[in-house]
C-alpha cells in the first residue's frame, strides 16, 4: 500500500560493514535477524527477476589505490557483496512499485525510466564476434533473447574473456533514458519502471517524489508542460556524467601507467579498428593502444567483416580475445592515452 510515512533510523550502517556470508556481524543481534530475513526475501526477488528475463551484468569495476598525495599507486577490483544485492533488490522493487502507481493515472504525465530493445545491427555484430570466440548464441528472437544473453553471461563468468564479452554485450544495448511515455525496461525485463530511490540522490528522483506526493494527497499535478523537456535534459546530463566518469578513470589509468614505461605486461585484445588494436592489461585492467604502424614483421590491414587485423604477407591474425605480450611505450596525460608496443602474440 502506498502512503506517506516518516522513517526513523535506529542505526546507521553501510553494505561493506555487513558480511552476510559470515557468522560474524558488526551489528546487534536484533538488527542481524532483521537483515537476515530481508536477505532471504531479496534472494527470492532476485531469482524471480532472473526467471522473468532480467539481465544480470556483472562487469568488473576497477578502482585505484591512492597515496597521501592522491596519486594512483595500485589498482583493485571493486567487490560486489551479498549486502549490495540486498539493497539493490529493494531499490528496484520500490522503483517498480512507484511506476505501477504512475501507470494507473492515465490522464497525468509522469516520468519513467525506459530502456528500448537492443539495436538489431549491433546484436548481429555481437553474434558474429562471440562466435569467433567460441560462443554460439542467437539474439534474433524476442522470446528467448533475455534468456540467451543471461546464458552467455553465465557461461563466461569464469572465462579469461569475461570482461571483454561483458563490454561487448553492454555496448550492444540501447541507452536507458527518461521519458513520459512508458515503453518498459528491456534490461530489467520490467513493463513499468522509474527512478524513485537510489544510493545517490538524483534530481529526477525529486521530480518523481513530488509527483507521487501529489497523487497521494489528491492534488493536481503541476508542471506537466515541462516534464518532457526535463526528461530530455536530464537524460543528456546523465550521458555527460557517464562520459566524465569514464574520462576520469582513463586519466587515472594514464597516471598510474606513467610509472610503468618500458615494463612488459600480458594483455587481452579488447578492440580492433583501422588505426590499430586496443589491449586491456590483465593484471590491472588498464587499456592501451597499439598503432597499426607499430605492429611488427608485416604490413597489417583491418578486416572489418571478420573483425580482425591481418598481415598482408605472413597472414598473421590478431583477433578479439587474443592474449598478447606488450610493452608500455609511453603515456600522454593530456590526451589520456597509453601507447603500447607489441612484443609477441601468446
Question: Across the structure, where does each feature detected by a protein language model lie?
Answer:
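Conserved, carboxylate-rich catalytic/transport cores that coordinate ions
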Residues: 1-346
